[in-house]
Amino acid sequence: MTLLIQNVRCWNGGGFHTADVLLQGGKIKSLGTSISSDGVNALFDARGQYFLIPGFVDVHVHLREPGFSYKETIATGSGAAAAAGYTTVCAMPNLTPAPDTPAHLAEEQAIIDRDAKIQVLPFASITKGRKGSGELVDFEALSPKVVGFSDDGCGVQDEGLMREAMARCKALNKVISAHCEVNDLLNGGYIHDGAYCKAHGHRGMSSASEWKMIERDCRLASDTGCRYHVCHISTKESVEVIREAKKSGVPVTCETGPHYLVLCDEDLQEDGRFKMNPPLRSRSDRRSEERRVGK
């Protein structure tokens, strides 16, 4: 089966240009201008209204298998990603069992090999049981089979533990992807410690619970040279800490989520569907993140 798509808008690394695309057996065979339609089985004129771009990569997804398949599976999550144009996703380790040993990682990898619709690259946990404390995993044994290490959902509380993790990951050329949350600063909170929280008598999570750990970890990344990625930042202080660290040459990157760019704590309206971690922050936090997207 050959398909010729004419007049599609193609991304060339610096912008879009109009071209024709010839597909054979569902794969691109050639890309150019004025490709002949002789011998093709199907012809479609995109009229400049469709776009051809490289596959997207999502560095933070939750496929939840093994252990939580009632929430998501590798088949459903990777299938949804494929439908949206993603060709690679990096799977977080909030699983049961956590991928903290080669044997536990092999359980996850077996499901990936069987069910994944696209490339799925797993993270291993930083600590045993993904607890953010206690004993570090065997980085050296896990490293060849993972994209990096993360305790996503838990912040690594002890500075010495995180320093050792970064030093070992630096030696292995692996990234640490960190959920940043200082437990002692959470105050039993469950939404942002802002005006809405106070007006409605809720217990709030301080912004410092996030940015203080980012500040610590940026210093450790500077000391060790480890590549450091910050998960789902939500505060304006986090944005500035990371911006200053990058200016100083620290190998740090970060991400946020679409909900932190379009919603804030004013949108809560006592609706539990808006509860998440990190929580929706203030309008000024949202605007700060919005201004820094892609910078």
Per-range role (PLM):
Residues 59-72, 121-134, 153, 202-208:
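Active-site mouth loops of central-metabolism enzymes
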Residues 70-78, 130-140, 216:
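Short, acidic/polar
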